[in-house]
Amino acid sequence: MKSRFLIRNTKITNSTGYRPVAWLFFMLYATVCFLACSNATDEAAQFFLKGNVQLQKREYKEAIRYYSEAITKKPDFADAYNNRGLAKFRNDDREGALADYTRALDIDPDFNTAYFNRAEARLETGDPGGSLSDLQRVEKQYRDSTFYQVRLGDTYVRLTKLSDAQSAYDRALQLKNDNVEALTNRGALYYSQKAYQPAEADIRRALQLNPKQDAALNNLSLLLAHRGNYADALTYVEQALELQPRQPYYLNNKAYLLLKLNRPSEAFPLVQESLQRDSQNAWAHQTLGLYWLGQKQSDKALTEFRIAEKLDASVDQLYYYIGMVEMAKGNRARACEAWQRGELANDDLAIKQRALQCL
């Protein structure tokens, strides 16, 4: 489920900052490995340990280099493939991470950590079914982990199994009531169901626990925008962008808010950059359509709205805007048809417009 709201990937916090939850698992696994390793693999082990140091320092390219050296020395080194996958994932190479996790599992089919890590990579590369399969594979070992439950909830969201997602987030918070990611993601789920009060409660609680949780900052921004508080909303999404300057959802959300604040010249380059980074985000295409609508270029606006519709027909108010463009072009029948589809999606603006123009 793509939206302006962001489901934040599961992370944990320690004295060195954020690491993937799997860090705990692979460190435990690696300790066992090295106690048992023979002298013949000492050189590979040293490269592996150097890679771990670089991964902890967030020097991902260096970590990848060391893990690759370890693999050269020991081609069946499942831990090195797994950890190189982590480094690639954090360096925005999702496909490379997926390949490394799969290779680790080819070598060791019982490597539970690699299943857990691959679940995230599959989710981020558009395979939520595969992600769920991997999570189910390790459910017995990790079902009492709050981080596992968050990942499970995220996967169910992508599969539009929202009641299952709710249960997983609830379980995550039962296990650890200050899990910031669980609060952030459950808040996003509430928002998608138009349960705005519990959404805000979860998101504000997440920010109390971690004021620099960028996804929660973004999501609070959109809650404020929903109320029409665009200026206040802008301050929160700008804070999110200070933490994650390249995040395409945040770029798009800032562009959307700038349009609402009648600052289209500032919005246009932001939505363009957002689409360069993620061309499949229906919300960004809607924002670009809104820009063209404001510039009175109906054909360009309609093109973007139709792209958004093809990518995700559940985008809020999409059919209201499609109807407005069709009406502006003199296509009353098509406008009424669009508003009727919006009515089926429970879009208040489309319902109101259809009542005024079509009934």
Region locations from a protein language model:
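Bacterial signal peptide processing site
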Residues: 38-40
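Alpha-helical segment of the N-proximal tetratricopeptide repeat
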Residues: 42-73, 86, 90, 120, ...
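Helix-start (N-cap) detector for alpha-helical repeat units in TPR-like alpha-solenoids
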Residues: 43-45, 78-79, 112-113, 145-147, ...
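Canonical tetratricopeptide repeat
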Residues: 49, 83, 90, 117, ...
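Structural signature of tandem alpha-helical TPR/SEL1-like repeats
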Residues: 57-66, 91-103, 125-137, 159-171, ...
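Structural marker of alpha-solenoid helical repeat scaffolds
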Residues: 73, 107, 141-142, 175, ...
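Terminal, low-structured helical/coil segments at or just beyond the last alpha-helical repeat
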Residues: 317-359
